[in-house]
């Protein structure tokens, strides 16, 4: 028995200003700032037993700000070598945490059709805003916010890439990257928990004893082959091979929930001019995606049967879902008016043509005393009518 009452609302306003200055043919300067004003109305209660009192998880109604400032310079050493460098600063008013981020990149043009690039950047990220306001009751009966002083999660990011234009309307891009994360929120006690896995189980984060002492590592290789739209057709192939690990407060390195190891996408489309005067168009688009499955913590069926509630295994993120596969096809026909700037498009978008069963999540079914699986959207035809004028 679990009962929840929630009202989690966030309203955001942005104030932006920037200034650009071209000093000469080699130097370019840009400075600016952004103030993100977050209006929050968080109220969440949970009740896990029928006759138990409700537990207040969030009860906060106010606002806070994330202020950012930056300075960026671009300098051309020559026609073939360009430097981009800058500083980015963050200030979070809620707990006065700050982050200064140096970044720079070099681009070397080997020829008019190919170039190398290298980049480094220190990047900082706020935690999900509701995490700061998780509340609990201390021994004196006072409401406390143990996560309120969490710092930014930070990462050092290194990239080396190569770009090639082998023919007109074609581009090939490859990139190798390495990312080292630190200041990741983990439990104050020894555990496998890490904020890096937030969102993997589609549930509400209720960890209220966090500290910025976790780490993580991501690295991989990406390849993109693109045919820009011309002569009535286009194409795009993207792929990535990667590894993603994290370390919790127990000091053990594990796969992150999102460590699918690989993903690739194929997108192609063709368009024909038809009808009187070739004004109308018919088209077909094809998309195919295949990705390694996410890692997950299996359910301990025996313990769940004993307690009557879902109990997870101690082998955290030790199992992997089957790979994700999906194929979409879209057919379209566009009527263009002869005398008016008016067009009408009819299209049939068939999603997951093969009706492949992609795993969404697992849960414990108390009635059948076994694991129950939920799946993502299956075969789904979608008819669309659009008018433009």
Regions found by a protein language model. Name each.
Residues 1-95, 173, 236:
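Face-selective signature of the C-terminal outer-membrane beta-barrel domain
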Residues 8, 12-18, 57-68, 151, ...:
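Outer membrane beta-barrel strand-and-loop segments of large Gram-negative receptors
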Residues 9-13, 61-67, 98-100, 154-158, ...:
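Residues that define the transmembrane beta-barrel architecture of outer-membrane proteins
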Residues 22-26, 80, 113, 169, ...:
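Short loop/turn motifs that connect adjacent beta-strands in outer-membrane beta-barrel proteins
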Residues 31-37, 85-89, 118-122, 174-180, ...:
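Transmembrane beta-barrel strands of outer-membrane/channel proteins
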Residues 46-48, 93, 113-157, 178-204, ...:
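Surface-exposed extracellular loop regions of Gram-negative outer-membrane beta-barrel proteins
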Residues 178, 202-293:
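Gram-negative outer-membrane beta-barrel transporters
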Residues 235, 277-279, 289-308, 324-326, ...:
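C-terminal beta-signal and adjacent terminal beta-strands/loops
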């Amino acid at each position: 028995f679990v009962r929840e009452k929630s009202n989690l609302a966030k309203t955001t306003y942005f104030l932006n200003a920037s200034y650009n200055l071209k000093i000469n043919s080699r130097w370019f300067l840009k400075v600016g700032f952004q103030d993100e004003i977050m209006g929050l109305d968080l109220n969440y209660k949970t009740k896990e037993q029928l006759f138990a009192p409700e537990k207040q998880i969030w009860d906060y109604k106010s606002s806070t700000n994330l202020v950012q400032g930056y300075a960026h310079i671009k300098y051309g050493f020559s026609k073939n070598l360009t430097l981009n460098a800058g500083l980015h600063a963050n200030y979070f008013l809620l707990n006065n945490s700050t982050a200064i981020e140096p970044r720079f990149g070099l681009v070397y043009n080997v020829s008019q059709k190919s170039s190398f690039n290298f980049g480094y950047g220190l990047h900082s990220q706020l935690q999900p805003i509701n995490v700061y306001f998780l509340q609990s009751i201390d021994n004196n009966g006072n409401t406390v916010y143990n996560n309120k002083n969490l710092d930014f999660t930070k990462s050092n990011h290194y990239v080396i890439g190569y770009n090639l234009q082998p023919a007109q309307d074609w581009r090939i891009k490859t990139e190798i990257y390495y990312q080292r994360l630190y200041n990741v929120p983990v439990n104050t006690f020894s555990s496998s928990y890490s904020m890096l896995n937030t969102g993997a189980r589609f549930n509400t984060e209720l960890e209220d004893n966090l500290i910025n002492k976790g780490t993580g590592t991501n690295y991989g290789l990406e390849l993109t082959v693109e045919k820009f739209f011309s002569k009535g057709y286009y194409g795009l192939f993207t792929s990535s091979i990667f590894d993603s690990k994290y370390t919790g407060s127990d000091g053990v390195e594990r796969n992150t929930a999102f460590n699918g190891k690989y993903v690739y996408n194929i997108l192609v489309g063709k368009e024909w001019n038809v009808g009187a005067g070739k004004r109308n168009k018919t088209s077909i688009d094809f998309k195919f995606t295949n990705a390694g499955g996410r890692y997950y913590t299996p359910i301990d069926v025996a313990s769940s049967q004993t307690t009557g509630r879902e109990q997870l295994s101690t082998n955290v993120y030790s199992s992997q879902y089957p790979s994700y596969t999906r194929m979409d096809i879209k057919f379209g026909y566009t009527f263009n008016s002869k005398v008016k700037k008016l067009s009408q498009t009819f299209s049939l978008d068939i999603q997951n043509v093969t009706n492949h069963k992609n795993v969404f999540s697992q849960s414990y079914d108390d009635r059948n005393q076994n694991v129950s699986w939920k799946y993502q959207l299956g075969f789904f035809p979608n008819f669309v009518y659009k008018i433009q004028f």
